[in-house]
Amino acid sequence: MTDTMPTPRTPASAWREMVRGNARFVAGEPSHPRQDVERRESLGTGQAPHAALFGCSDSRLAAEIIFDKGLGDLFVVRNAGQVISDSVIGSLEYAVAVLQVPLIVVLGHDECGAVRAAIDSQQPDATPLPPHIATLIAPIIPAVTRVADEHDGHADAQEVGREHLRDTVAELLESSELISDAVAAGSLAIVGANYRLVEGTAVPDVVLGAV
């Protein structure tokens, strides 16, 4: 029988469930909730996800596994490097305005290939990237530049990743009046977190709203 946990409807309760699920995953004791036939049937006519998650496309960043969630629990948007675009903003606005999620998690991670590509692209002897990849990673370059300027030209990948995560959250707020208004009204929170591949932990770095 499917787990019938009530859908979290406040930012704090939604984040609390994300933290609990991640703790189960880290401990190696996932409950794999809401993944049975009954759950599939109940979702046939609609969805009421607990949260939206915008993360990197990296194959090691499987959101429902990391947070021990089930079918219909998360509205997930992903691209390489978790880079803001019109399609990302539109998808997240849909989650907030139509699905009424109380929480957006922006999830970066260590050892990110997009971050590494952005760093390497700034080297004097860098091989030009294919045009679509170059366009994709362009929003990461400001974080590379800032970190390099602060560390005598050396851009540490983990620090660049953290800076880019903060940039992503800031750009989301600046680009979407709908989302920024929801945060200001208290109906939505945004948590920017970094996922540690080996440990399995999702560590908050940026928190906007009451969680």
Please give the residue ranges for each predicted region.
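Divalent-metal-activated hydrolytic enzyme cores
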Residues: 2-45, 72, 81-100, 113-211
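Short beta-strand segments
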Residues: 54-56, 78, 105-109, 191-196
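Gly/Ser/Thr-rich loops at beta-strand to alpha-helix junctions
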Residues: 58-60, 109-114
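Active-site cofactor/substrate anionic-group-binding motifs, chiefly glycine-
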Residues: 50, 54-91
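Short active-site oxyanion
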Residues: 50-52, 101-104
